[in-house]
């Protein structure tokens, strides 16, 4: 039996020794995936994939540069002109993506293990949260394929007007490392469903699961060249993809600063479409009349400490009414210490893994030190957990006595760091929440429906949760206001963004 088969059959109940054994046997693909097969980089460049829990190299991977992006785009262009994918009957394309979803589900243990080793996500989270969401994403967009409809408009007698929806052509997707396969699927699935060809550049820090996904697409019946994956960094590989004259659209998730660069690359090249999902500094607002403080606290710490705080919509700003502030902080600290257990991410009992790299860890710790220098008070955390010095760990951290002008209240940290701020009334809470360059998400906790409705209308965010945080399904558009981006992922709205309309006017007179 192959290593992949062993991993595929691994039950979710495996303990740490079993996962560690499987990790040692795992067959890791190291090439670029172009034209239906793994290939070496043309210039022979390579880079190491590092396990952030141990600091050890997992594998030496091919590094794609401009020449490899050219090769991948050329493969996609050949597939586009051949028409086997874009002209495939909708039901047939649906069958391929449905089969791909089934293969992802069958290989979820292998894919989860790749993500845990690659970026430090606890294996239990990867297996029970991320991978089921990836499967749901491909299934949802498979079901959407035959729902893409055109229109016949009312016109004068003797004329016929048709409006058709067509794919764009070649889509360049640049995905982040925090949810490697899930964030890639939010781009790849709708782009493929609409009939496009795709060149994916996964994050250099965590490309392994995306490389495997491309091979599963071929196994599902996808034509070679329709879906290609090129490893590499942002300044070389990502830039080449965003500048390429044959790419019709770039979809990017990452920092606001890089998003601005990509918009510039579109202007420098062919005015390609640019879809950006960028930074966030999401407020969670807790009104004095909320119904269940314990339940609110449970969701509050999950909103910032899950995935070690490496979430674009992380609820890192905790705006708490003065009347419940002290009780909130006490419960938050007590429960967070009970729930988040740093450790080996291959141990199913671990609930907090490392951050993605040692460099990122040092950046998060520097932000914590800056918060202390600015006068905020540490209520918990503030450094590295003991006994895990070999990995890139950061303890769950909570600041109190935070003022609106402090860096920890304004800058995205992308780590397990939360800041509590007091407010006196609804108007002040809204003003504090909206005082940000970001507008990705927000939440409101109140038992008063009128209050909730007013605040939903007033908050400058693309997603607002009421008495919950992070909930939703594939029907929910996800994206932000202001410098959090200009697009929506998930939902049918996202699918339309990978199409263009064509108007056909017939003179029948």
Locate each region found by the language model:
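Terminal low-complexity tails and localization/encapsulation signals of metabolic enzymes
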Residues: 1-61, 95, 99, 148-174, ...
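Glycine-rich loop-to-alpha-helix module at the N-terminal edge of alpha/beta enzyme cores
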Residues: 56-148
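Rossmann-like NAD(P) dinucleotide-binding subdomain of oxidoreductase/dehydrogenase enzymes
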Residues: 149-295, 423
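ALDH superfamily catalytic-core signature
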Residues: 249, 257-403, 432, 466
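Short, well-ordered beta-strand elements within core beta-sheets of diverse protein domains
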Residues: 58-64, 81-85, 173, 284-288, ...
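Residue-level signal for inorganic ion chemistry
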Residues: 55, 93, 115, 138, ...
